[in-house]
């Protein structure tokens, strides 16, 4: 059974395995730089360890592959009979991280 972990990042919980690429909210790191996720909620595999609320001493290490922005989401507001129109676009930034190790 392969080892996996559930980490908290960007206000979300993400299940990760070694070698997996994940997309998370933007991190302040450049491409090629290593990042460590210390907020580990669960480590699973042979012996599953559930944190209360976090697993003590556990961490997940990954490498930033790239920074980017998601596809544009367009919002359009319209008020009838008032001649009021408003169009706004938003592109959420993200970071692509490849998981290298799960330290339990």
UniProtKB/Swiss-Prot annotation:
Pfam families: Ribosomal_L21p. GO terms for cellular component: cytoplasm; ribonucleoprotein complex; ribosome. PROSITE patterns: RIBOSOMAL_L21. One of its GO terms (molecular function) is rRNA binding. GO terms for biological process: translation. The keyword Nucleotide-binding does not apply. SUPFAM superfamilies: L21p-like. Keywords: Ribonucleoprotein, Ribosomal protein, RNA-binding, rRNA-binding. The keyword Heme does not apply. InterPro entries: bL21-like, bL21-like_sf, Ribosomal_bL21, Ribosomal_bL21_CS. This protein binds to 23S rRNA in the presence of protein L20. Belongs to the bacterial ribosomal protein bL21 family. Part of the 50S ribosomal subunit. Contacts protein L20. PANTHER family: 50S RIBOSOMAL PROTEIN L21, LARGE RIBOSOMAL SUBUNIT PROTEIN BL21M. This is Large ribosomal subunit protein bL21. It comes from Streptococcus sanguinis (strain SK36).
